Amino acid sequence: MKISSVCLIFFLFIGHLAAQQPRMSGNPIIKGWYADPEGTIFGNQYWIYPTYSAPYDEQVFLDAFSSPNLVDWQKHPRIIDTSAVKWAHRAMWAPAIVKKDNHYFLFFAANDIQHSDQEGGIGIGISDRPDGPYKDYLGKPLLNKFHHGAQPIDQFVFHDKDGRYYLIYGGWGHCNIARLKDDFTGFLPFKDGIVFKEITPEDYVEGPDMFVRHGKYYFMWSEGGWGGPNYRVAYAMADSPFGPFKRIGVILKQDPHVATGAGHHSVIKIPGKDEWYIVYHRRPLGETDANHRVTCIDRMYFDARGFIVPVKITREGVAERDLSK
């Protein structure tokens, strides 16, 4: 009888401890092959907009995922596809999204153009809902030319603290910044008359991202080849979105015990908190297909001087974080 009582107390204690442990997201956080994730928050929901990771001719749509807590994710399939964008035929990549004037603007690259005479580049979808469906906003690419050697892909829309919106983009080892018109129908020249300013830092390849913390502009990007194990994320800091950006170092990379090819990321900040998450893709151990990439999330921290602490990629992911509480 005493043994049964002791066992009951023990199991009740273990159950109490388990109830106190936060649920973890696990990594990857969504099922399927997805890369280049754009993470953001709309209302009390987290959203992720990734690239469908497949051969270019199969990349003819974009899916989205939403969650109230970083643990339970809902898939929103085909929020936009090439049937809605007549000039897009393949290689729909690296979505970036902003909400403005009660509309959601989904920026994406399509067709993987190799020179300015080809059809394709960076386009915009528009919807009155974050889960779409999105229709072609302009009926043509927003940007379809090479400037300063930058392939028009990997777009990021940066909303500065003065209210201005900038397009930061570029592949092939070059990155440009351009000020968007208020209605996103084109670009406004800077005071010197230049429309596209190159801000390429050392070792930049693709996948730019920018945010502001404590008055400093953090510029992040991916280095290495996306199909290899050494894909990684580095960063720089400056007092302006135009730099100059001097490379500080790598903050996200492979862990031979966890995964390889960790890169092409985005950053989520909890509103009103100095609490940060990095959303990125990586390749599971043992996978040799370049397109076998999965979307993951981990915490991102800063040291006392404001430098980013190198991220530890994990299998556990992050703890449940409900935005409504």
Model-inferred region functions:
Residues M1-Q21:
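Bacterial Sec-dependent N-terminal signal peptides
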Residues A19-K325:
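Carbohydrate-active catalytic/glycan-binding domains of CAZyme proteins
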